[in-house]
From Swiss-Prot:
Its EC number is 2.7.1.71. Substrate binds at residues 33, 57, 79, 136. PANTHER family: SHIKIMATE KINASE (PTHR21087), SHIKIMATE KINASE 1, CHLOROPLASTIC (PTHR21087:SF16). The gene is aroK. The keyword rRNA-binding does not apply. This is Shikimate kinase. It comes from Pelotomaculum thermopropionicum (strain DSM 13744 / JCM 10971 / SI). Pathway: Metabolic intermediate biosynthesis; chorismate biosynthesis; chorismate from D-erythrose 4-phosphate and phosphoenolpyruvate: step 5/7. Belongs to the shikimate kinase family. Keywords: Amino-acid biosynthesis, Aromatic amino acid biosynthesis, ATP-binding, Cytoplasm, Kinase, Magnesium, Metal-binding, Nucleotide-binding, Transferase. It comes from the Bacteria.
Amino acid sequence: MKNIVLIGFMGTGKTAVGRRLAGRLKREFIDTDAEIEKVTGKTVAQIFARDGQIRFRSEEALLVRKLAGKENLVISTGGGMVLNPENVRLLKENGVLIALTADPEVICRRVKNKKNRPLLMRGDLRENIKALLKEREGVYDVAEHKVDTGSMSLDQAVENIIHFLKEHNYIE
């Protein structure tokens, strides 16, 4: 069975939804940021600070190549994973992409106390979020389905995804 790949901006709930969805579907859950941290022995913030965004994106690309050959996973990606068209191609080869969305205010509320968001660390948080969202406009349109996690509970988001997957014969 195809992988279920959650994409979307940081703070949209990919990890929380992914964990719950994997539990409901009895599938293995993979959080790409956590996997990269495990492989490198550094946090995402440390990789960005010490090695730069380019190094982090190359770690993402290596991981995607590894995951593309697997099945029955629920994969939660980093917010910028889909900036690389090759990542998108590989993830779509054996996966269905689901984009999680939320408005800037919801994202701001969710990430404001987290120190592991290197792209938001400088300047005004709300303005950084709005600028990055504008910069990434359309990037998440590669998904087969979108879920606004800002307008529903975690369980409602999971149910929405399961309904979509059943309706389109990705799961039984």
